């Protein structure tokens, strides 16, 4: 093998590793114990996610400036009463309480809005929306970075089945 071929192979390997790193950082939801997150409600009072044990729960990490987050929350709002009536939705941000309340009051979504006491980066959430589904035992049964098409009937059925 020539030096040029070895050099090309090394460059391809390095680029592949960089690609894998970026994919894992931005497209794979970090493993986390969602029910033990430190969060506060819109009045800055601590909120215990454990209190939702026994209920199916969608935990959506969002930001008020994120178009895909807003789109996903809008879709969840549209289908909540008809198709997700037995599911609680937690909308969690790392923005200020003021921004949380402005967004909450503007959108009027029937979700529980919470603020992290840490930043997304501290939790290794590098891309939003990031969604976790919890079953009735409070266990994470699904996680995804990026927009979920909740209007797709087969996707919705699959995700609801996971929460059972």
Predicted feature residues:
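Positively charged n-region of N-terminal signal peptides that target proteins for export
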Residues: 1-5
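Hydrophobic membrane-insertion alpha-helices, especially the h-region
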Residues: 8-21
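N-terminal "domain-start" segment that seeds a small globular fold
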Residues: 20-49
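Short pre-active-site segment immediately N-terminal to redox-active cysteine/selenocysteine motifs
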Residues: 55-57, 61-65, 127
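Conserved redox-active cysteine motifs that mediate thiol-disulfide chemistry
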Residues: 61-78
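Short alpha-helix adjacent to the SAM-binding motif of class I
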Residues: 71, 78, 98-106
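Short, internal strand/loop/helix patches
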Residues: 90, 101-137
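Thiol-/selenol-based redox modules, centered on thioredoxin-like
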Residues: 133-164
């Amino acid at each position: 093998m020539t030096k040029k071929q070895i050099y090309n192979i090394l460059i391809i390997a390095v680029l592949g590793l960089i690609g894998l790193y970026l994919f894992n950082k931005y497209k794979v939801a970090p493993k986390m114990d969602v029910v033990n997150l430190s969060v506060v409600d819109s009045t800055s009072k601590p909120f215990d996610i454990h209190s939702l044990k026994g209920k199916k729960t969608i935990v959506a990490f969002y930001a008020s400036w994120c178009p895909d987050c807003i789109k996903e929350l809008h879709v969840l709002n549209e289908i909540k009463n008809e198709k997700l009536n037995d599911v609680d939705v937690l909308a969690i941000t790392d923005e200020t309480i003021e921004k949380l309340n402005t967004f909450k009051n503007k959108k009027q979504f029937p979700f529980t809005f919470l603020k992290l006491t840490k930043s997304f980066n501290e939790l290794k959430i590098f891309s939003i929306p990031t969604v976790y589904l919890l079953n009735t035992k409070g266990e994470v049964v699904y996680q995804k970075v990026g927009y979920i098409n909740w209007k797709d009937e087969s996707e919705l059925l699959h995700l609801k089945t996971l929460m059972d």
